[in-house]
Amino acid sequence: MSTSLAVVRLDPDLPLPSRAHDGDAGVDLYSAQDVELGPGERALVPTGVAVAIPHGMVGLIHPRSGLAARVGLSIVNTPGTVDAGYRGEIKVCLINLDTSTPITIGRGDRIAQLLVQRVELPELVEVTSFDEAGLADTTRGDGGYGSSGGHASL
């Protein structure tokens, strides 16, 4: 099943988001400006496009794995969220995770990828306890960060 996605090209000199290979989940987003990121620096980078995510779906902005592995370029709030009601330009909050080498991003470079997925929109129902709501206890309970172990330091 194929869903269409309305895309407005805000910068006519940049390519539309595109898949590198047939069947890829994400479409590449391009930088609309030149950016220099020093070690540890971050910048909000425009992509020159706006999209209309359909109701009941969400756009998720992910780092490009090759850039993360090769030069340490990532996204601060990964994945970034593009809600169905948002109609502005997609911007990506990039960060240079390398501690010693600056990263130069050129206008037109692929900087991130957009995935569009269906999302549940549950109605929130306040309860005083999970027992009252008829929700069974779990073996995890309220165990949070590090509660499952799996690393020598935990």
Curated annotation (Swiss-Prot):
* Residues bound to substrate: R64, S65, G66, N77, T81, V82, D83, K91
**Protein name per UniProt:** Deoxyuridine 5'-triphosphate nucleotidohydrolase
Q: Which HAMAP family match?
A: dUTPase_bact (MF_00116)
Q: Which cofactor does it need?
A: Mg(2+)
> What binding partners and quaternary form does the record give?
Homotrimer.
Q: What does this protein do?
A: This enzyme is involved in nucleotide metabolism: it produces dUMP, the immediate precursor of thymidine nucleotides and it decreases the intracellular concentration of dUTP so that uracil cannot be incorporated into DNA.
Keyword entries, A-Z:
Hydrolase, Magnesium, Metal-binding, Nucleotide metabolism
Q: In which pathway does it act?
A: Pyrimidine metabolism; dUMP biosynthesis; dUMP from dCTP (dUTP route): step 2/2
Q: Does this UniProt record's set of keywords contain ATP-binding?
A: no
Further remarks about this protein from its record: Each trimer binds three substrate molecules. The ligands are bound between subunits, and for each substrate molecule, residues from adjacent subunits contribute to the binding interactions.
**Protein transport among keywords:** no
